[in-house]
Swiss-Prot record:
Family assignment from sequence similarity: Belongs to the ketol-acid reductoisomerase family.
A Gene Ontology molecular function term of the record: ketol-acid reductoisomerase activity
Gene that this sequence comes from: ilvC
Co-factor binding comment: Binds 2 magnesium ions per subunit.
Protein species of origin: Saccharolobus solfataricus (strain ATCC 35092 / DSM 1617 / JCM 11322 / P2)
Active-site residue numbers: 111
Function according to Swiss-Prot or TrEMBL: Involved in the biosynthesis of branched-chain amino acids (BCAA). Catalyzes an alkyl-migration followed by a ketol-acid reduction of (S)-2-acetolactate (S2AL) to yield (R)-2,3-dihydroxy-isovalerate. In the isomerase reaction, S2AL is rearranged via a Mg-dependent methyl migration to produce 3-hydroxy-3-methyl-2-ketobutyrate (HMKB). In the reductase reaction, this 2-ketoacid undergoes a metal-dependent reduction by NADPH to yield (R)-2,3-dihydroxy-isovalerate.
Species lineage: Archaea, Thermoproteota, Thermoprotei, Sulfolobales, Sulfolobaceae
Protein name: Ketol-acid reductoisomerase (NADP(+))
Catalytic activities: (2R)-2,3-dihydroxy-3-methylbutanoate + NADP(+) = (2S)-2-acetolactate + NADPH + H(+); (2R,3R)-2,3-dihydroxy-3-methylpentanoate + NADP(+) = (S)-2-ethyl-2-hydroxy-3-oxobutanoate + NADPH + H(+)
Keyword Repressor assigned: no
Keyword entries, A-Z: Amino-acid biosynthesis, Branched-chain amino acid biosynthesis, Magnesium, Metal-binding, NADP, Oxidoreductase
Length: 335
């Protein structure tokens, strides 16, 4: 079965559409730094908008990119790219962008959260679109410098000019994404699937599955060190195999015993009740319930996050993991 989506590549994107336009990248963290440098190296006019002078300000200067206070960066910008954390964007928008941006400037996002959940209400005369790279900022930069690119998603929320998609693809080309491929989506789809993946697999699901497996073995009297290797440490090797060869490639690489055990017991553990709760988690995302809770949590200083992190840091598996990582490092051959 082939991919059902159109995949945009370099031939579908034209940098000339945005050459000569002033691009303000807001934020200079992982993604902000990568985007700003890649767009600059693609021959585009880039400035960085920051709320205060500090380490990021000096880093931008050392990278050869002009840092400005956010208000100054956006006032002459034709394209404004939000690359600050989700929960910072609304305040930044209300205080430092909306009152100062010029009429008709494009608003660009790397994640749909604030637009989809209406935390930011964009002007009716602005094009609003998204380019969401499927990799961390350092990888976006590294691949670009090596002549490649990280795949991305592209979406248009508001197309006043009639050329929003074309400009989005030009930005995607500027950061190197069209070298790999850019898949069209919507703000709704990107936001909901991104949150779902984080919650049930990438962060929440994997974390709780590892911890539950480790604790089960320890409670049954097995050595914590052995339990850690079998339930947590070896996960990387399997994930690397899936990343490189897919799920079937991973299965071909493991022992027949592992294949049989995985195919039988895996469905016993991850059964229909788990799938039902996954759907419930998805409904919380789709209804906006999760977003409401997260905004409230953030406003209270993130007590759930702070307490949860403390719990993990003080857990037996974390203490054992710290010790075993030292052993692994000692055993690595000297380069």
């Amino acid at each position: 079965m082939k991919c059902t989506s159109k995949i945009y590549t370099d031939n579908d994107a034209n940098l000339d559409l945005i050459k000569g336009k002033r691009i303000a990248v807001l934020g200079y963290g992982s993604q902000g730094r990568a985007w700003a440098q890649n767009l600059r190296d693609s021959g585009l006019n880039v400035v960085v908008g920051l709320e205060r002078e500090g380490k990021s300000w000096e880093l931008a200067k050392s990278d050869g990119i002009t840092p400005l206070h956010t208000k100054d960066a956006v006032k002459d910008a034709d394209i404004i790219i939000f690359l600050v954390p989700d929960m910072v964007q609304r305040t930044l928008w209300l205080e430092s962008v909306q009152p100062y941006m010029k009429k008709g400037a494009d608003l660009v996002f790397a994640h749909g959260f604030n637009i989809h959940y209406k935390l930011i209400d964009p002007p009716k005369d602005s094009d609003v679109y998204m380019i969401a790279p499927k990799g961390p900022g350092p990888t976006v930069r590294e691949y670009y410098k090596a002549g490649g690119g990280v795949p991305a998603l592209v979406a248009v929320h508001q197309d006043v000019s009639g050329t929003a998609l074309h400009k989005a693809l030009a930005i995607a080309k500027g950061i190197g994404a069209t070298r790999a491929g850019v898949i069209p989506t919507t703000f709704k789809e990107e936001t909901e699937t991104d949150l779902f993946g984080e919650q049930v697999i990438l962060v929440g699901g994997i974390m709780e599955l590892m911890r539950a497996a480790f604790e089960t073995l320890v409670e049954e009297g097995y050595q914590p060190e052995v339990a850690y290797f079998e339930t947590i440490n070896e996960l990387k090797m399997l994930v690397d195999l899936v990343y490189e060869k897919g799920i079937s490639g991973m299965l071909k690489a493991v022992s027949d015993t592992a294949k049989y055990g995985g195919m039988t017991v895996g469905k016993f553990v991850i059964d229909e009740s788990v799938r039902k709760r996954m759907k419930e988690a998805l409904q919380r995302i789709k209804s906006g319930k999760f977003a409401e809770e997260w905004v409230e949590e953030y406003g209270r200083g993130m007590p759930t996050v702070v307490n949860g992190l403390s719990n993990v840091q003080n857990s037996l598996e974390e203490k054992i993991g710290n010790q075993l990582r030292d052993l692994v490092q000692k055993g690595k051959p000297k380069s």
